[in-house]
Amino acid sequence: MSPRASTTDLLRRTALRMFVDQGFDAVPVTAIAKAAGVSHMTFFRHFPTKEAVVVNDLFDPLIAAAVRAQPRQWRPLTRAVRGLVAAISEEPAREEMSSREFYERVRLAALTPSLAAAVRTAGQETERAIAAALVVPGVDDAAARAAAGAVMGAASSLLLAWAGENNAPDAGATSTATSTTGDAATVLSRGLLSLLGES
């Protein structure tokens, strides 16, 4: 791991611990930097905002590649749903989505209005990439944007509801976050497939 990556990881872990313990709004950037042993300017070299600690990378822009790989003859919504479901079915995505850190990040967003809005804003880059992947002969920009927006809006809502309705996993039991409704990837897949009339 590069020094930059390890500093980013240290800042994220420190911030998440403080947010969980004290609440997102109660923790200033200067306190995060101090607890991590860096300057507040170093914090801003790694994260443009305090919100970015929680919402960055929740939606991987590489999802667009999975959408692009879906059969071109399918309707835009079908391609978008199937592509996102395929992307989150991959082992690295499932592993990340079952981690305690992922749960804590989404849970913070679910319980903090400014973060819920930031999750939706952060997903816009992925949404634009999905829309671009959906434009093929016979599919116009409007249809592609509508399908991408529907899928990303649904994904955001499903994840926020999943984290908001579940208790934190037992710290001593496992490092994964699951509930009676399933892990994040399962809940997300099931919810997205319902857009196609499936479950």
What are the functions of these language-model segments?
Residues 1-22, 26-38, 55, 62:
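Basic, helix-initiating cap at the start of DNA-binding domains
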Residues 13, 82, 86, 125, ...:
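Short, residue-level hotspots on alpha-helical faces of the histone-fold
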Residues 38-47:
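Short hydrophobic/aromatic patch on the recognition helix
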Residues 51-53:
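A secondary-structure capping/hinge motif
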Residues 64-105:
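Hydrophobic alpha-helical connector segments
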Residues 108-137, 145, 149:
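Amphipathic alpha-helical packing segments from all-alpha helical-bundle domains
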